[in-house]
Structure formats: C-alpha cells, structure tokens
Amino acid sequence: YDYTLAKISDTSPTLHGELSHLLPTSGSTGSPKLVRHKYGNIEAAGLNISTFFELKESDRPLMVLPLYYTMGLSMVFSHLRVGATILITGLSMTDINFWKFLKEQRATSFTGVPYSFQILNLMRFFRMDLPHLELLTQGGGKMPTDLNIKFAEYCRDNGKRWIATYGQSECTARMAYLPAKWAVEKVGSIGIAVPNGELSLIDTDGNPITTPHTEGEM
C-alpha cells in the first residue's frame, strides 16, 4: 500500500478550566454536535430541577434514560443533590422483570420521553397497582395531546403528579415545566420558566411579545 509520513504535534489542546463535559445532541437540525458545559451549569441545573420537582432524600427514582442523554443525566445530578437513591436496571420496560424490580424497589418516580409513555400506554400501565409511584415526568419532545391528557388525568385521579417539561441540551436539559396543577387545563403548554430562570418571546425586531397567539422567537 502507498503511504505518507507526516509530522504532527504531539501536544494536546488546552481544555478550559471550567469545562466539565461534552454533551451530544442532534438538535433541531438533525446533525450531531457536542455542547460544552461547565461545572456551574450542572450545579445550577441540579438546584433548579430539584426545586421545581420538589425532590427529597427519600425519593427512589427509576433510571430508564441513558446517561449520555441530557435528560437522563439531569435526572441523576438533580436527585444526587438531595441525596436520593437512584434505581438502575438494564431491563427493558417490556420485560416483566422490569416491573417486578420497580415494585420491589418501591420506585417513587419515572422520567421518560414521549416514546416511553407510548410503550406504557400499550402495556396497560393504568391498570397496574403502583402505590409507591408519586411522580411521572416527561420531556424530550412534544407528546401527543391525547396521550398527555391521559397521563395527566390518571395522575390527578390517583394522587400522583404529572409534570411535562421543555428544554435543550444547550441549557443542561430543563428550561420550563408545566406545574402538575395545570397539567390537564394547560395541556400542550411548555409552562413556566424553571426557578432562577427567565423566558420571553420577541418579534423579528427584537421587541418583547406580550399578546397571546402571537408568533415569535423564544
């Protein structure tokens, strides 16, 4: 085979002192990219998320999302911040042993993307006896309205909380959430900004939008 010798530098580029990790995302464009996050981002997001979810040390969240995914990662550092116990299993949601694990370990919360809840819906989730499950949270894309309402009403009628969220990998996951008390009434809305955060809409000239049903940029 033909080959060419090339002299290259053996020095590595200097990393920024505050860089904690690179988070993969496809973003709205569909092309893969990496988002840079500093340690302060993790600390702030952990505080904000644990605050609006009202997380506590006795919580036992079930981990089903991958750690390289922004929402899965945010679930970890927000719960670790309050000293909660994170339940980890390699079992699929379609495996009967997954549900045995959930019940035996008394899981108190479940976080998923729209596809996760589509699977739960097909598995007759609403007929299951899950007395320890207190909180269901959703993110990772817009959920079909009928399915959103179905889970919101189930949680309302069974003493549980349903909280849909909106976010971006660039913002360490969650940027907005719809409080459980508005889950049915305001279904489809991204809700309000997370604690210590602000959201606003602007028009093409950069002016704030204050009227309803007006298109703009967030």
Predicted regions and their residues:
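Conserved beta-loop-beta connector loops within the AMP-binding
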Residues: 200-218
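Short Gly/Pro-enriched turn/cap motifs at secondary-structure boundaries
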Residues: 188-193
